[in-house]
Amino acid sequence: MADLSSLKDLGTASEAAAPAHVRKVDSLGRSYATGKRKNAVARVWVKPGSGKIIVNGKEFADYFARPVLQMILRQPIVAAARDGQFDIVATVAGGGLSGQAGAVRHGLSKALTYFEPGLRSVLKKGGFLTRDSRVVERKKYGKAKARRSFQFSKR
């Protein structure tokens, strides 16, 4: 390692050490990422195309029937202003529909940044690249649920 003699040298050394975000694409021209939310895990592939979104072999509007879930899934594409430019294929397992939609959104955001590193700042600012670590709190013994106590009778 180079000898750092002043603070100016330290600044240039840290700039050189910062990893540049490079494009990660497989032999078929796709970017791959995994997304997680609650107990759901999604594997997402992104490639240039007409804007088709397939989730577990179905059209995303058929798989996620509720409009709120469809909106959650499309948020990264809309935020990046890339609507209709990518074909997205996702397989998702575990959890319920809300967790699965969040997992696909997380994986899609990561895959978009791998395909187009310039989108990273926009998606990071929107909070799409951050893993939502909130999970259900476990039930404790001596309690009805995680925190709710059994009904108490004074007399």
UniProtKB/Swiss-Prot annotation:
Keywords: Ribonucleoprotein, Ribosomal protein
Any Pfam family the entry gives: Ribosomal_S9
A Gene Ontology molecular function term of the record: RNA binding
InterPro entries noted in UniProt: Ribosomal_Su5_D2-typ_SF (IPR020568), Ribosomal_uS9 (IPR000754), Ribosomal_uS9_bac/plastid (IPR023035), Ribosomal_uS9_CS (IPR020574), Ribsml_uS5_D2-typ_fold_subgr (IPR014721)
Gene3D superfamilies: 3.30.230.10
Signal peptide annotation: none
GO cellular component: a single term: cytosolic small ribosomal subunit
PROSITE patterns per the UniProt record, alphabetical: RIBOSOMAL_S9
Any single biological process term in GO: translation
PANTHER family attached to this UniProt entry: RIBOSOMAL PROTEIN S9 (PTHR21569), SMALL RIBOSOMAL SUBUNIT PROTEIN US9M (PTHR21569:SF1)
Family classification: Belongs to the universal ribosomal protein uS9 family.
Protein's name in the database: Small ribosomal subunit protein uS9
